[in-house]
């Protein structure tokens, strides 16, 4: 949102179209010239694509904010084996978040294939609402769940032994002449996140 607000302030006559999808589809759309720029949580293809890391984010396990999970947060202290007994809602296959979650769970000693995955959902807002309503727990980025955590709608548990986070990348086709709007958008991302060339 910060980037979109700044872009709109600087270029009020420009209109941008936003499509929410997983990292695999973002890269496909970039390669096939269906989109000029995109954002991914994982680096997938480097032959055609240029990735600019602009933000460090970490994944967290989110749960409903109930007495059971508040107690678990106090007692578990870094042990997430309880996750194996939960209904889990994941991002869809192809999602950078899902790929990164699998990697971090393995590092924490959890085999992702042992999870009781009851749903795979594309939209993060739908996942967060489903968790709030008690359908299950999920693994999403801390940034994506910040407002819900702050408001007390969900609880966030860190994943132990995770690294220092994952890069969120701006991606574009390096073999394709970008539109003026796309170049201006990339410039705004660089300004907002203070990225050197």
Regions found by a protein language model. Give the residues of each.
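Hydrophobic hinge/microswitch elements
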Residues: 22-27, 31-35, 40, 103-155
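Residues at or immediately flanking beta-strands
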Residues: 13-18, 116-118, 167-169
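Flexible hinge/capping segments at coil-to-helix
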Residues: 51-89, 93
